[in-house]
């Protein structure tokens, strides 16, 4: 990951585990989440993901996504170019995330907003954060249970169910606001 001296980085590296969305939504998600301060993006093949990529197609997409991340990083004055990692299966993504300090999974059956606020408020300087966002159709119950078993905490993003392309940006914006330093 290319790095330069900058005061534009958040105090905590945030990893976005994004369920593969349809169409070109992933490009938009990458662009906006890089602008908001994400450290790395992990595309994830979940059970309900409509998009199925073979190895050759996946590599081509990842190359394109990294070019988009680089462009967004330059535009927003980032000190790093966040990496878009190769597409992972759900279990691989959970294993990769195991090392992170705080793991969140926005989920419509999560406890109320106060529990989410408390979890976000507990994130402190230097901790690594993983956010799991489902594809269109969300996560299967078994996927949420596997994430919880690995230490991910279900959180709510409010009373509305957000689209896959909105959910990651929403929680990143909340974390950015909480973690921003003068």
Regions found by a protein language model. Give the residues of each.
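A short acidic, often aromatic-flanked loop/helix-cap motif at beta-alpha or helix-coil junctions
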Residues: 89-94, 111-113, 162
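Short, glycine/charged-enriched secondary-structure capping and boundary segments
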Residues: 31, 56-58, 118-121, 145-147, ...
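Active-site/ligand-binding-proximal alpha/beta "capping" segment
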Residues: 100-138, 142-143, 152-155
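RNA substrate-binding interface of SAM-dependent RNA methyltransferases
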Residues: 1-104
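Short, glycine/serine-rich, charged loops/turns that create anion-binding
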Residues: 21, 48, 110, 136, ...
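Residue-level recognition of oxygen-bearing side chains
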Residues: 25, 89, 138, 166-167
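Structured adenosyl-cofactor binding patch, chiefly the S-adenosyl-L-methionine
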Residues: 140-182
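Conserved residues at beta->alpha junctions
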Residues: 20, 107, 135, 165-166
């Amino acid at each position: 990951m290319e790095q330069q001296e900058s005061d534009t980085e958040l105090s905590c590296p945030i990893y976005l585990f994004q369920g593969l969305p349809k169409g070109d939504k992933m490009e938009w998600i990458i662009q906006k989440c890089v602008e908001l301060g994400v450290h790395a993006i992990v595309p994830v093949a979940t059970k309900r993901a409509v998009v199925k990529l073979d190895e050759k197609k996946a590599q081509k997409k990842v190359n394109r996504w990294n070019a988009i991340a680089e462009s967004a990083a330059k535009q927003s004055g980032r000190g790093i170019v966040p990496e878009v990692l190769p597409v992972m299966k759900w279990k691989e993504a959970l294993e990769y995330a195991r090392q992170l300090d705080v793991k969140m999974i926005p989920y419509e059956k999560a406890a109320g907003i106060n529990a989410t606020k408390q979890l976000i408020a507990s994130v402190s300087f230097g901790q690594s954060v993983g956010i799991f966002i489902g594809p269109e159709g969300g996560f299967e119950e078994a996927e949420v249970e596997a994430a919880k078993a690995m230490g991910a905490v279900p959180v709510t993003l409010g009373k509305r169910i957000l689209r896959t392309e909105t959910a990651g940006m929403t929680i990143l914006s909340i974390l950015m606001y909480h973690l921003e330093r003068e």
